[in-house]
Amino acid sequence: MTIEHDFFGILGSDDEGEVYWSEQVELGSESVDIDLNSPDEASVSVEALDIAAAMIRSIEDLDSQAKESLVADLSAENSQTLQYIRQAVEELDDEALANALIWDSGDRQIDFLRSLRLQRVGFRPHHTASDEHFAVLDYSISPDDTDTLLVVALDVNGDPVTISVES
């Protein structure tokens, strides 16, 4: 069985009902990898695909929403965002860090967050509950110098569910 969608085209595969789609989109001067996958085609609704397509079409807004959640996380007691910043400052040499920070407003933490580069957005169209990871955004301060990512998971409404650091 396959699903046909105006934005994604024909989805589905012969692999036991799995759904997979990938593409690259431009965000400013950067390319961002986008993928959509579900282990079960039957659990993917057209509405969820429409929401994912709308998020991809407005990738700048999605990026802004995720970065706003990172700013809000700075004040959290166990802030994953602060952990990522500290880890990057320790891991990267001064030159790599200076090259990665493209903003200089005087607020080092905000400049760091504004300088994050969106690497990938993964959509899980079978996760449509308000506490599930519908869109997962992977950020890096310097993709050539570190494999560590700051990951923001958003629900189907675009609200943050979790923020984590992944290596």
Predicted regions and their residues:
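Acidic, proline/glycine-rich low-complexity IDRs
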Residues: 1-23, 110-167
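Long, contiguous N-terminal structural blocks used for assembly/anchoring
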Residues: 1-99
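Amphipathic protein-protein interaction modules
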Residues: 61-144
